């Protein structure tokens, strides 16, 4: 009968009544036995009941515990022990002592522990995907599988009800109608009921389209906002959170419905017609401040029209700051007997004249002295700056502030641009540029121009934010204005392709790029981002890198970064060059965080390689150091597109090549044995020569100081390379010496020993060596791959490997060799080619104890150098006392 329940019985019939019987474990103990130890069945042996008095003795429990294990002699002879007391039968026969040795059996982990751990990891990844798809809410731990199953059932039930309503001929069977009638009736008249802690309605949780509900909510929010315009054309925006939102269209409509007349609406309209606000506010105090000073009169009409034509054809076509028909209408009025007297218009027309003069100087159409006229027109605009910020609330004032900011970006001091952009964005909030404004009653031309002006302010704000490390003014969570039109009727922003068959909207592309810059700062460098865990930050770096690469791939090949620029028009080339510079800077800023935290040397690399992360990891995060250095090289190569001379446009992009020089300088000090170190020094020299061409007069002290600093960087890098080359030759000589004593060979740095802190440095080492520790560390000849047992040593950014000729090379050099990078920058940065970069041949190295940083915290660029400010006007007095200055001489000996 033992086989019953496991198959057919003797007559060939299945026995289903026994299939669900609980299996008998460990020898088939009876269900009727007493609760407790499973040995109770064995202890009911009548042998123990034959001995008198055994049941009542105090040592009865101890004797029973000993029977669970045979005596030592029976175990040694591997015979069955009957457990009799005081001696078992075999011990009596052999006349030996009957000894029971108590041995505690260690419990091993269950065999399925690893399997369960794998299931948990897979389940975690599934939950992460479900959260991304909207099936799970973000409340961790509150949504279990039962709740999820209920939601799916409700959704399925709702879909069934909708299908039944669509097909009236569909009828239920009699058997199913009784079991599903209640659910079907409820589904036909209401949407599926959600729990109180359920996620918001999405495509996965509600049969209704989420876009419709989102549109309704946004439309209601727009209706609760108000944009009031007075008789002067000035507007005033009031948001929905304000206590005065009752003056919004929705609020006025509500009052009209409750009162039954329009008296409230008429009173509000008449009140705003007489709105003067600042016009006569404290005239005895601010009259002299608001007085308009003219530093240079406007040019004659013909000359002005020529300048305006240059502005709209060469500048406004890419940066649509003004609507040309509206602007030219005001120009005609300006040169009539009834000019428009608004301060916003006065500042705007002078800003356009200033930018037009500067464009002519940049194109070598006029002498350099013409730039003085540009500054005089700018002074005219700056003369009404107080009135623009304290008094005006019109679109022309925002445009004038942005125009002044764009002009002053071509100066050594970026502080005015910071202030002007911030003022422009705050003023744009006053007139509601950051909102869609569907209920403002504006015509399509006005709506499009408002979008363009806002996005110019937005991209300037985000560019300043990323380069200076200062928080942005515009909050991305409190704006819903769409991107500019991709193909507008006036063709603004469109650039023809080289084949003549297509076009590309450069302005819209720059606006999309600004949104990525905003995410980079917010998710990597803001105060909130610093609270992320290492794993979250690593995933964020991969996501931002992927989004940046998708943006780059959307650009036509003629203007795409990492490719030659195919444009002949000088102003257009400058716009594309700025686009390329910005891309490389953003790429470096993303991966700088990975390099600084040493993610590719941490345990997270092993964690990701084993597939334990919940989301697929971008493999480029383990190439962050290579990407930063390669982007720096590409940035310096863009200098050839910049006009030579002391032009204002140079200040727009001077940050990028100087920042790239600092990156190459730090990489050379960290990896002096890099195969491209010599070529990197030549690139540093290109930057130095570029700066030297800008020193045109004695008054340009900013360029001179920058030139001196960059020249010192180049000299130190050259000294470090010469020193590393001499040390490499001396190492090879010591290796080649056959008669060298064994004890001396063990002291050479070519073995896998870690030098002690008391080891002396070479006398010729530069003083900066302590700040930038070199990574030409000894090679571990005993290993052939990364030491995964110590993941903090694997994948070090400055890792030394054994080259093909036996000379130690850096990890970056090995990556260049394996990927066939060379000058093929596009292939290097392509995500599809990441598989060609292998880590299997890398040799981990020992970190010297004399370095102040561990391998986990050892970026190839020190953190202080990453924080180089955007402004050139540094406090040079403080820098001269704090910045390390090289004073040593290289060691001429081996």
Swiss-Prot record:
Sequence segments annotated as region (Disordered): 159-219, 724-797
Coiled coil: none
Transmembrane segments: 649-669
DNA-binding region: 71-98
Biased composition (Low complexity): 175-189
Presence of the UniProt keyword Transmembrane helix in the record: yes
Effect of inactivating the gene: Results in a hypersensitivity to miconazole.
Alphabetical keyword list: DNA-binding, Membrane, Metal-binding, Nucleus, Transcription, Transcription regulation, Transmembrane, Transmembrane helix, Virulence, Zinc
Topology of this chain in the membrane: Single-pass membrane protein
Main location: nucleus
One GO BP: positive regulation of metabolic process
Polar residues: compositionally biased ranges: 159-174, 199-210, 751-761, 771-792
MF-aspect GO terms: DNA binding; DNA-binding transcription factor activity, RNA polymerase II-specific; zinc ion binding
A single GO cellular-component term on record: nucleus
Biased composition (Basic and acidic residues): 736-750
InterPro entries, alphabetized: AtrR-like, Transcription_factor_dom_fun, Zn2-C6_fun-type_DNA-bd_sf, Zn2Cys6_DnaBD
Cell compartments where the protein resides: Nucleus; Membrane
Function comment: Transcription factor that regulates expression of the genes related to resistance to azole compounds.
Protein name: ABC-transporter-regulating transcription factor
Organism of derivation: Aspergillus oryzae (strain ATCC 42149 / RIB 40)
């Amino acid at each position: 009968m033992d086989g019953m329940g496991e198959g057919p019985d003797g007559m060939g019939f299945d026995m289903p009544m026994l299939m669900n019987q609980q299996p008998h474990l460990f020898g088939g103990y009876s269900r009727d036995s007493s609760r407790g130890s499973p040995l109770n069945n064995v202890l009911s042996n009548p042998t123990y009941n034959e001995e008198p008095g055994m049941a009542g003795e105090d040592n009865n429990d101890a004797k029973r515990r000993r029977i669970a294990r045979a005596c030592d002699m029976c175990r040694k002879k591997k015979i069955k022990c009957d457990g009799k007391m005081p001696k078992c039968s075999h011990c009596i026969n052999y006349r030996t002592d009957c000894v029971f040795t108590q041995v505690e059996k260690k419990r091993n982990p269950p065999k399925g522990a690893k399997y369960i751990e794998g299931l948990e990891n897979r389940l975690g990844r599934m939950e992460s995907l479900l959260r991304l798809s909207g099936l799970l809410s973000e409340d961790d731990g509150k949504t279990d599988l039962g709740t999820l199953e209920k939601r799916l059932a409700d959704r399925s039930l709702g879909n069934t009800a909708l299908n039944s309503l669509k097909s009236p001929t569909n009828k239920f069977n009699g058997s199913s109608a009784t079991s599903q009638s209640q659910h079907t009736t409820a589904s036909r008249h209401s949407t599926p009921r959600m729990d109180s802690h359920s996620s918001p309605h999405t495509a996965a949780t509600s049969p209704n389209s989420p876009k419709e509900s989102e549109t309704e909510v946004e439309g209601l929010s727009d209706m609760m906002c108000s944009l009031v315009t007075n008789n002067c054309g000035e507007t005033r925006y009031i948001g929905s959170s304000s206590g005065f939102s009752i003056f919004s269209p929705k609020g006025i409509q509500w009052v009209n419905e409750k009162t039954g007349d329009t008296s409230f609406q008429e009173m509000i309209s008449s009140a705003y017609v007489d709105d003067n606000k600042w016009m006569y506010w404290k005239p005895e105090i601010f009259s002299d401040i608001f007085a308009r000073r003219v530093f240079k009169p406007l040019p004659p009409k013909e000359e002005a029209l020529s300048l305006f034509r240059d502005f709209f054809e060469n500048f406004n076509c890419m940066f649509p700051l003004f609507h040309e028909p509206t602007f030219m209408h005001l120009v005609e009025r300006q040169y009539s007997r009834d000019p428009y007297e608004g301060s916003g218009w006065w500042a705007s027309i002078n800003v356009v004249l200033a930018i037009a003069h500067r464009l002519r100087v940049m194109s070598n159409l006029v002498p350099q002295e013409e730039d003085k006229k540009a500054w005089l027109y700018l002074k005219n605009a700056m003369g009404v700056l107080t009135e623009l910020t304290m008094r005006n609330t019109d679109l022309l004032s925002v445009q004038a502030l942005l125009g002044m900011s764009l002009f002053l970006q071509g100066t050594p001091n970026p502080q005015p641009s910071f202030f002007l952009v911030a003022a422009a964005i705050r003023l744009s909030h006053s007139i509601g540029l950051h909102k869609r404004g569907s209920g403002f009653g504006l015509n399509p031309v006005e709506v499009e121009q408002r979008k363009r002006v806002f996005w110019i302010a937005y991209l300037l704000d985000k560019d300043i934010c990323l380069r200076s490390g200062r928080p942005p003014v515009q909050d991305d969570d409190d704006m819903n204005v769409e991107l500019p039109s991709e193909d507008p009727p006036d063709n603004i922003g469109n650039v023809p392709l080289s084949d003549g068959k297509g076009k590309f909207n450069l302005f819209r592309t720059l606006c999309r790029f600004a949104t990525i810059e905003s995410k980079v700062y917010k998710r990597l460098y803001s105060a909130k981002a610093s609270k992320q865990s290492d794993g979250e930050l690593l995933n964020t770096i991969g996501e931002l890198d992927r989004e940046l690469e998708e943006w780059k791939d959307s650009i036509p090949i003629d203007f795409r970064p990492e490719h030659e620029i195919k444009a002949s028009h000088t102003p257009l080339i400058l716009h594309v060059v700025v686009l390329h510079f910005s891309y490389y800077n953003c790429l470096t800023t993303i991966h700088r965080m990975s390099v600084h935290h040493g993610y590719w040397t941490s345990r997270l690399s092993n964690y990701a390689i084993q597939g334990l992360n919940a989301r697929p990891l971008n493999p480029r995060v383990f190439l962050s150091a290579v990407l930063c250095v390669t982007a720096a090289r590409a940035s310096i190569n863009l200098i050839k597109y910049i006009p030579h001379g002391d032009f204002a446009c140079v200040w727009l992009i001077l940050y990028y090549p100087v920042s790239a020089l600092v990156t190459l300088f730090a990489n050379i000090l960290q990896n002096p044995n890099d195969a491209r170190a010599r070529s990197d020094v030549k690139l540093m020299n290109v930057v130095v020569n570029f700066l030297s061409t800008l020193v045109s007069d004695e008054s340009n002290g900013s360029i001179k100081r920058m030139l001196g600093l960059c020249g010192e960087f180049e000299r130190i890098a050259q000294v470090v390379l010469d020193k590393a080359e001499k040390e490499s030759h001396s190492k090879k000589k010591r290796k080649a010496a056959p008669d060298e004593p064994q004890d001396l060979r063990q002291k050479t740095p070519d073995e896998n020993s870690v030098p002690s802190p008391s080891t002396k440095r070479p006398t010729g080492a530069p003083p900066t060596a302590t700040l930038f520790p070199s990574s030409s560390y000894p090679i571990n000849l005993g290993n052939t791959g990364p030491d995964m047992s110590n993941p903090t040593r694997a994948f070090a950014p400055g890792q030394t490997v054994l080259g093909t000729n036996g000379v130690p090379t850096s990890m970056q050099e090995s990556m260049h060799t394996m990927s066939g990078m060379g000058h093929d920058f596009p292939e290097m940065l392509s995500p599809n080619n990441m598989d060609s970069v292998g880590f299997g041949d890398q040799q981990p190295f020992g970190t010297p104890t004399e370095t102040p940083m561990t391998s986990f915290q050892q970026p190839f660029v020190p953190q202080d150098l990453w924080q180089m400010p955007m402004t050139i006007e540094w406090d040079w007095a403080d820098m001269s006392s704090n910045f390390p200055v090289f004073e040593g001489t290289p060691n001429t000996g081996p």
